[in-house]
């Protein structure tokens, strides 16, 4: 089973894996069963909890939700609440604004830029935000006497004095922001309520904020989202989409909404808007359509469980107001005929509510309802849960079956996988629309703000391509493609492990595939230097128990590796095999789906990759690049959440064992929710140092940690807690042991895009492009690298943030080393997007979180058994 196929088979949550038959089965005549063995009985009206004009439900509560964390900026709870609504969820990246790590790294305080490499002209998806001279944002606190609870009322009373405060303002019920300063520091005004009650309003100046203050940065983002709403963009999650410009793909019953991601932050020289293209994929089938389709596929007694498995966790879009909700539960005891209490105390059925409120007719009166634990506050009241009618909800996203449909993905890519020139054109449309919209321009003028009309241009660098070293041979590769599979195909490996005693397990229907694999392995292994005997071939029934029984009976202490030919990508069978061979009976294993061997024209290429994988899993070494630094240990860490319980976090920890970076120590930390993952990482580091000493007879003098899996808002915790824990761990190794430590945070999910200017057009920057100016952050020692090549669409850079460094290595050296390590991932004969130890750590954590669900046996720790 190839890594890519395995990721697709296992890498998505259960709610995304349904096979979707033809849609349109729903009709008023059909009835979904309420219980496995009986049709729904007539229901008495049910009474969900009272809510304000949003139908609430009787869904089972799944425990209290986590309260939103307070932002690290001193604004107000109300302003945070306002910003959450306008920002599209919790923008945890604002927590990282106050983390200034560069000042503590002495050798980069003055300059963090490198100089090696050839210059390249680049354009980035950034627009400068400018403000008028001496611009400031004025922050006021507003008090009411007597106290007014409702935010809408507080706003109405304050806005009676727009002659004083002006029409340009942002108010959250407590904090008022103005683009001008009021005449007095404290201003008292009086307003009247509708019933004639006098209210004294005290407006007190609390802050005069410069353009670069963290509060202003947050404020800019809120104003920008206000502008998007003015242009009729629809907020879905964090991003904004244009429902009036949809792209229809009728032959696949899909709709694509174009949209944008956006963020305004302080960068090296200026405050800038980073805008990128985003697409929302909608399906033209409703949840009810899907339920009826599923009902035709499964046994009646399993129907409700199947619905829960497929729908809980899925995001749906309501057809009446284009809002998205997460399905948290299905209430089979309610239906559209049930009633709920409105804010005025009157009762209304869901049928009547949706007809009066949205002019939506509900045809199936016996369908169950969906429950969304909608987490949003109105004033001091938490709104939720929300009841949704399946018939009125469209499904979003793609199922696993859709993702495996080559023609569908090809047709979808035409609209979503944009070339650099297409992407630049689409991003430019955003600012063009803003320029043409008079309301938007007036809002910006009133605040004293404006955006550049052209994208940011600057100069980057392209470092030289690496030479691939393989058993005395040196290979160059085409740097434009960053792939050396052809060049190294006939060369022996650095260290080839023999296939003396190995098992090949297959089913009767897959005998031909097993035989083809064996014959082709005999063809490709000699040039690699792999000595190979014929496998012990064992036929089994196509059942999980049969595979496990054969494994238990056939594996001996001399077995090198087990190869299993599987009929399909069935996750339960794969998981059972991997769990047994990674924990109970530790031995390297290779699973291959039979159909991947079915095409004669690609069989040799596929078997070559399988042979390389098998060699790695047994402890072999494939290739290397020149690493000038000596006595250097590289560590990669990545985190993953267990799919079985959702309550475990898994950290993959991978550390180099030799100076050539060709052998790795791998270990996993499985932590329950609430436990600190770093405690387990300390133990991993101690064990890795012991293993390094066994291999080299000395300890490393430098340790560089590449830390992936750090979410937005977690940077402060990593710097102030995780890094000190690593330092404490090193002290326990020995009194005189004081290696130089570097910790680099790796971030793949970035909106930044670079376009290379070439011959009057734009193309992707070549692999090895480094950017450490303009779009990096002044308070960080950070840089971007474009390491991989892509055939279609736009290449995505990776962001590296050096948060701790006592190495005193020049920025050039850190950047070059990072790029070198992107060549060392043995599951791909080419350059990948992150340093190899990060990808190894990800693969390990992914395998444990998806299939094994416990720590693998340590006897495998010196092999890349998880590739």
Curated annotation (Swiss-Prot):
Region (MID region): 485-621
Piwi domain: residues covered: 561-853
PTM per Swiss-Prot/TrEMBL: Methylated on arginine residues; required for the interaction with Tudor domain-containing protein and subsequent localization to the meiotic nuage, also named P granule.
PROSITE patterns, per the entry: PAZ (PS50821), PIWI (PS50822)
Basic residues bias: start-end ranges: 1-11
Biased segments, Polar residues type: 28-44
Segments traversing the membrane: none
A GO MF term: RNA endonuclease activity
CDD domains tied to this protein: PAZ_piwi_like, Piwi_piwi-like_Euk
Predominant subcellular localization, coarse grouping: cytoplasm
Needed cofactors: Mg(2+)
Active site residues according to the UniProt entry: 638, 676, 708, 842
The keyword Secreted belongs to this UniProt entry's keyword annotation: no
Role noted for this protein: Endoribonuclease that plays a central role in postnatal germ cells by repressing transposable elements and preventing their mobilization, which is essential for the germline integrity. Acts via the piRNA metabolic process, which mediates the repression of transposable elements during meiosis by forming complexes composed of piRNAs and Piwi proteins and govern the methylation and subsequent repression of transposons.
Family named by the database record: Belongs to the argonaute family. Piwi subfamily.
Protein name (Swiss-Prot/TrEMBL): Piwi-like protein 1
Record organism: Gallus gallus
């Amino acid at each position: 089973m190839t890594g890519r196929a395995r990721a697709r088979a296992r890498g998505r949550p259960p709610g995304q894996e349904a096979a979707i038959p033809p849609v349109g089965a729903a009709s008023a005549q059909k009835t979904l069963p309420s219980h496995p063995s009986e049709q729904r009985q007539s229901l008495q009206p049910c009474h969900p909890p009272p809510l304000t004009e949003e139908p609430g439900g009787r869904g089972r509560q799944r425990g209290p939700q986590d309260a939103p964390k307070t932002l690290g900026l001193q604004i107000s709870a109300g302003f945070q609440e306002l910003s959450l609504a306008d920002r599209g969820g919790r923008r945890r990246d604002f927590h990282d604004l106050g983390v200034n790590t560069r000042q503590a790294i002495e050798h980069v305080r003055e300059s963090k830029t490198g100089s090696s490499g050839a210059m390249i002209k680049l354009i980035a998806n950034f627009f400068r935000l400018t403000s008028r001279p001496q611009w400031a944002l004025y922050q006021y606190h507003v008090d009411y006497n007597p106290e007014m609870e409702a935010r809408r009322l507080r706003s109405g009373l304050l806005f009676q004095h727009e002659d004083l405060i002006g029409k340009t303002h942002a108010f959250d019920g407590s904090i008022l922001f103005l683009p001008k300063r009021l005449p007095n520091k404290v201003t008292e005004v009086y307003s009247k309520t509708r019933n004639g009650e006098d209210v004294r309003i005290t407006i007190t100046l609390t802050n005069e904020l410069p353009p670069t203050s963290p509060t202003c940065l947050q404020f800019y983002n809120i104003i920008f989202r206000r502008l998007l709403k003015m242009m009729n963009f629809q907020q879905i999650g964090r991003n904004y989409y244009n429902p009036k410009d949809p792209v229809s793909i009728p032959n696949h019953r899909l709709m694509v909404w174009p949209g944008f991601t956006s963020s305004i932050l302080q960068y090296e020289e200026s405050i800038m808007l980073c805008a990128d293209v985003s697409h929302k994929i909608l399906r033209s089938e409703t949840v009810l359509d899907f339920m009826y389709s599923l009902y035709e596929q499964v046994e009646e007694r399993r129907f409700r469980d199947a619905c829960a498995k497929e729908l809980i966790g899925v995001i749906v879009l309501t057809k009446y107001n284009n809002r998205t909700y997460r399905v948290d539960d299905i209430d089979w005891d309610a239906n559209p005929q049930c009633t709920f209490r409105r804010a005025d105390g009157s009762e209304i059925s869901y049928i009547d509510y949706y007809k009066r409120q949205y002019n939506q007719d509900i045809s199936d009166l016996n369908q169950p309802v969906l429950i969304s634990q909608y987490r949003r506050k109105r004033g001091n009241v938490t709104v939720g849960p929300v009841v949704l009618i399946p018939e009125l909800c469209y499904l979003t996203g793609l199922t696993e079956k859709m993702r495996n449909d080559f023609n569908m993905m090809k047709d979808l890519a035409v609209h979503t996988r944009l070339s650099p020139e297409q992407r630049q054109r689409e991003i430019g449309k955003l600012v063009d629309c803003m320029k043409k919209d008079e309301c938007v321009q007036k809002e910006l003028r009133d605040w004293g703000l404006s955006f550049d009309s052209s994208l940011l241009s600057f100069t980057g660098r392209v470092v030289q391509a690496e030479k691939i070293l393989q058993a005395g041979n040196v290979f160059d590769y085409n740097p434009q493609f960053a792939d050396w599979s052809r060049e190294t195909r006939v060369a022996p490996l650095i260290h080839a492990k023999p296939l003396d005693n190995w098992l090949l397990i297959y089913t009767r229907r897959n005998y031909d595939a097993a035989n083809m694999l064996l014959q082709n392995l005999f063809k490709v292994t000699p040039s690699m230097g792999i000595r190979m005997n014929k496998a012990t071939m064992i036929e089994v029934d196509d059942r999980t128990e049969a595979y496990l029984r054969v494994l238990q009976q056939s594996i001996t202490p001399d077995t090198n590796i087990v190869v299993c030919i599987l009929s399909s990508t069935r996750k339960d069978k794969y998981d059972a095999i991997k769990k047994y061979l990674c924990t109970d009976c530790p031995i390297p294993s290779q699973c291959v789906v039979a159909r991947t061997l079915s095409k004669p024209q690609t069989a040799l290429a596929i078997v070559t990759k399988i042979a390389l994988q098998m060699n790695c899993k047994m402890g072999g070494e494939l290739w290397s690049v020149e690493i000038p630094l000596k006595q250097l240990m590289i560590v990669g860490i990545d985190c993953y959440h267990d799919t079985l319980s959702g309550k475990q976090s898994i950290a993959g920890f991978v550390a180099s064992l030799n100076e050539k970076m060709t052998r790795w120590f791998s270990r996993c930390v499985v932590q329950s929710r609430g436990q600190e993952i770093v405690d387990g990482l300390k133990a991993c580091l101690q064990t890795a140092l012991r293993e390094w000493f066994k291999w080299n007879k000395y300890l490393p003098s430098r340790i560089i940690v590449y830390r992936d899996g750090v979410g937005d808002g977690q940077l402060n915790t990593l710097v102030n807690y995780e890094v000190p824990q690593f330092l404490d761990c090193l002290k326990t190794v020995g009194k005189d042991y004081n290696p130089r430590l570097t910790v680099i945070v790796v971030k793949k999910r970035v909106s930044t895009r670079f376009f290379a200017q070439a011959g009057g057009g734009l193309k992707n920057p070549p692999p090895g492009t480094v950017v450490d100016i303009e779009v990096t952050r002044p308070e960080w020692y950070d840089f971007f690298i474009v390491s991989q090549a892509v055939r279609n669409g736009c290449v995505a850079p990776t962001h590296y943030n050096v948060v701790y460094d006592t190495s005193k290595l020049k920025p050039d050296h850190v950047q070059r080393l990072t790029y070198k390590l992107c060549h060392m991932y043995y599951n791909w004969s080419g350059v990948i997007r992150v340093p190899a130890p990060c990808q190894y750590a990800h693969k390990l954590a992914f395998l444990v979180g998806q299939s094994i669900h416990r720590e693998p046996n340590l006897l495998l720790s010196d092999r890349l058994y998880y590739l």
